[in-house]
């Protein structure tokens, strides 16, 4: 059974670590919850999802507010399929071709697609559920997914005992979604064609933990939320009025709202994405290395990209553009955002799905950031083993500030090593990073202009602060950094437009005594192990993982049969390359690389991600 394991060590474990001579009595900053999408997390994972979602909403608003419009008028294209009908462009093979779009000479790299999604006639409609359903234990049972793939119902905010006609604490309608044998994502959307109601959607687990919330869809007072329903468990969706105090103080107890806000009727649709709703597909011609971004607004809530062979290579029902590099030009905002790097020339399709009514989709294409540099400039990845001062605000955590991180050598005793072993460990880390990035991407990627320079603090002067230099700090601890993680990157930057970013690989959990964490390297060491090569390879793989984020790759599925550098945390044995014997540093160990693999299903994306070529095209020799 797949385990839903991404998260972080509890503060009690993390802050009690005594690693490499660091005492728990030493002053340490308050520990922050990182965004799991940016981090490589320990296997013993507990995430403060309420904190994660608060942080995401804050960063999302800041990203959209700060996004400057790029110059140039977009090409516009309206779908040819008649409004309210299906069948004309519903698959990648029947996509409508948009000529004139692209990054080549005489092409327009900006495109606006408009169209209309017809309703799904197969969604069953059920009568409104009876009050009182104002708390999780009283949630109305929708039967999704057991009832089928979707359900449509209606309700009223203000019709129960807690509305303006009751005690005035505010009406909250809860709906139960029942998990099956496997986890799934459900898309929940409100529609308020009449009345004054401005809806708020929120999702909770069975214990009342807030999992997410959404206020207004672009251009309306309606709401849409993607909800994860774990296998064998239930999730709960709440419909309420938007505004200050919209969430109840205790979702387990009815009547715990703060005030009455807007009231009125609403329609509610809950769908798993497996129905027969309309989808519209449009084809565009891309060149190898083109960085494609798409953002859907209006009534469309999913955007999907297919390659020339018809494979889904990126599907998204969410906006995570706030994780892009600060200066990334890629489209942001809207209901769903996707990004993709074309590994070869060809005709690709952009699909619009999951909704009913008018939509517009912004599609833009760029060449990789480093390709715009002067000849013959190349990007540098600097591996810093000497310790560093890092302002953790760049990782989007709160609280944040300047943090001093200890060097690699401080953690050597945790593996039973001494200062005399430091050079050998560094040799193996550097060799692994170079094999994963310099060698494999040059040998196996499609970028004939691939070029990158990997430097390190032992053998080279520190170039950090110079143009075109990103760094990975290998050292420090949770207590020192204030971030509960093993690894974290500054951004997920398709096209590598940031070019001067920072990632961390913390070493305290990795050097815990055997058995205290499955993410400790000591757990896999025995007298039969080639200890230093194994330690160097494991740290090198995590270092390459964080560099992979900064160069544009998202997490891949860590629990399938294929071990990949971009696998999410939770299966450290795979990331470390431990072979079938369960022992690190033996002959059956596995060479873990960047490669094609399934995007991590627990992060809400779908499709096959080619992390090898996403990373290869991020490091392109300057062409200007």
Region locations from a protein language model:
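Secretory targeting and sorting signals
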Residues: 2-27
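Acidic, Ser/Thr/Pro-rich low-complexity intrinsically disordered segments
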Residues: 30-46, 51-63, 115-127, 131, ...
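Predominantly extracellular/luminal regions of secreted and cell-surface proteins
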Residues: 31-108, 123-152, 379, 385, ...
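Surface-exposed intrinsically disordered loops and tails
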Residues: 119-122, 144-146, 158-167, 246-258, ...
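Fold-level signature of zinc-dependent metallopeptidase catalytic domains
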Residues: 334, 343-345, 360-431, 520, ...
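Ser/Thr/Pro-rich, low-complexity mucin-like regions
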Residues: 344-358, 365-367, 547-551
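Metzincin-family zinc-dependent endopeptidase catalytic domain
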Residues: 374-380, 384-388, 423-562, 571
